[in-house]
């Protein structure tokens, strides 16, 4: 569809992160974290044509049945997008996340050395946390690609939907999409364990079953990367523990045993030019931290983080100051 292709091309030219399309409303773009409205008004008929262009028959049927849908899409130039379709006041809306075709390197993202070193781990659980649109997927993609370039491993990703597309290099990579290649994250994770993986990427720890399967995968000698929608390390630990009504002590012990690091991030506008840069909090799982988790003293994690600089830990305040000193923000 020519109109949609033109909108997507313009969004990329403006370096937008998201394209918002709603029937009988102006098209909006999110640029450098701010929503900007255009003068283009989209009709209900145009939205229907866009949906028919983006979705296949099965997806259209699921959308009609459920009223909302997540999927991946490639435009006429083969450029990728993550799409969410839902209803607002009885009308369909589309939000299209623009995904870069090339996976950025850790250096391009200015990832702290402690974060880059997570790609060298052999096993355990690494959590990457932050709000929606904070760059979690991009950080994980850079780490997975670093492993792909440098290590001879079998990497399996579970995503909903698939965003960045990897090409196997030193590693062998298989990407599985929830809803297409597997029914759910939890079911996919249990299946992955029978596929001889070394590294597993879980797009989101969205329920108790997925969290439990991820902990088991890390416990059985795999390196597991996963995301959570929390703003800080304490919130991430509590989110996992609060997912379980029973057996809380067992989960505390299991998490304390397998956790390697928690990386929390937010995007800040650059002071010069356009674009944003990630500001990080990095918590490394030392023996002392494992004891805090095991003993249920999660309220002390924030204080412990401040004193962990020698172990490579980083608070957002410290990293923000580093970014300011470099003239980035």
Locations of the language-model features?
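Short, flexible helix-loop junctions that flank or precede catalytic/ligand sites
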Residues: 2-329
């Amino acid at each position: 569809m020519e109109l949609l292709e033109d909108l997507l091309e313009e969004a990329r030219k403006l370096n937008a992160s998201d394209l918002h399309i709603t029937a009988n409303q102006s098209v909006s773009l999110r640029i450098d974290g701010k929503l900007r409205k255009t003068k283009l008004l989209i009709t209900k008929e145009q939205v229907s044509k866009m949906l028919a262009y983006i979705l296949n028959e099965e997806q259209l049927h699921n959308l009609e049945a459920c009223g909302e849908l997540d999927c991946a899409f490639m435009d006429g130039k083969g450029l990728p997008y993550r799409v969410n379709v839902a209803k607002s006041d009885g009308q369909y809306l589309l939000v299209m996340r623009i995904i870069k075709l090339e996976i950025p390197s850790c250096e391009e993202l200015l990832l702290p050395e402690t974060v880059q070193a997570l790609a060298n781990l052999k096993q355990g659980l690494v959590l990457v946390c932050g709000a929606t649109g904070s760059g979690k997927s991009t950080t994980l993609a850079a780490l997975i690609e670093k492993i792909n370039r440098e290590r001879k491993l079998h990497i399996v990703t579970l995503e909903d939907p698939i965003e960045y597309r990897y090409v196997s290099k030193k590693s062998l990579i298989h990407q599985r999409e929830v809803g297409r290649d597997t029914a759910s994250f939890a079911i996919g994770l249990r299946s992955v364990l029978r596929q001889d993986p070394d590294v597993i990427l879980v797009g989101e720890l969205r329920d108790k079953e997925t969290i439990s399967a991820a902990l088991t995968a890390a416990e059985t000698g795999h390196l597991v990367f996963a995301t959570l929608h929390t703003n800080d390390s304490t919130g991430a630990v509590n989110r996992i523990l609060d997912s379980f009504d029973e057996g809380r002590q067992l989960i505390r012990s299991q998490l304390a045993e397998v956790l390697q690091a928690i990386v929390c991030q937010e995007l800040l506008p650059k002071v010069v030019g356009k674009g944003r840069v990630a500001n990080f909090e990095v918590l490394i799982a030392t023996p002392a931290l494992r004891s805090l988790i095991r003993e249920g003293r999660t309220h002390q994690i924030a204080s412990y983080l401040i004193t962990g600089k020698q172990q490579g830990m980083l608070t957002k305040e410290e990293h923000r100051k580093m970014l300011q000193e470099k003239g980035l923000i």
